[in-house]
């Protein structure tokens, strides 16, 4: 299971935000890609909030405007339940491309849970930022390489 605690590039949200809903953006993004010219998207394709009319933005935790909608809370509860039920078992805390923008959300908790669970392992793939604390070094794999290439190599 995946929990996009930091957001999802596949969702729009109001840039204000005037409400706590997100919207699937795949169709709109594909249309933007198809119709862009000279690296510009036609202004009529720029998404607008259906409630207040302000521009929409990606659903990413970049500042205090991040929208946590019903789906986010449902996924957060699933994640919490998983950790409660399986956090003492053999588990791999896999981190893909997590930097130091908000390390307290993913990185530090993963390190902490790895240190506290003798059966846990930590792995990160992040070009330029693959590291772990000395305390969990013996049960960690840090790959300082391009994620896309690593996944292609793993999948053969």
Q: Each predicted region: which residue ranges?
A:
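Conserved catalytic alpha/beta core of Sir2/sirtuin-type deacylases, generalized to analogous enzyme cores
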Residues: 1-156
């Amino acid at each position: 299971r995946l929990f996009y605690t930091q957001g999802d590039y596949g969702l729009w949200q109001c840039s204000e935000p005037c409400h706590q809903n997100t919207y699937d953006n795949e169709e709109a993004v594909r249309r933007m890609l198809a119709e862009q010219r000279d690296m510009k998207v036609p202004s009529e394709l720029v998404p607008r909030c259906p409630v207040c009319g302000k521009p929409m933005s990606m659903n990413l935790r970049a500042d205090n405007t991040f929208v946590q909608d019903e789906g986010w809370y449902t996924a957060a509860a699933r994640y919490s339940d998983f950790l409660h039920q399986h956090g003492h078992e053999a588990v791999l805390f896999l981190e893909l491309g997590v930097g130091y923008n908000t390390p307290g959300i993913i990185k530090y908790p993963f390190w902490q849970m790895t240190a506290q669970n003798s059966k846990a392992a930590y792995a990160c793939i992040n070009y330029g930022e693959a590291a772990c604390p000395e305390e969990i070094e013996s049960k960690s794999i840090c790959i300082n390489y391009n994620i896309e290439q690593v996944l292609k190599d793993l999948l053969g």
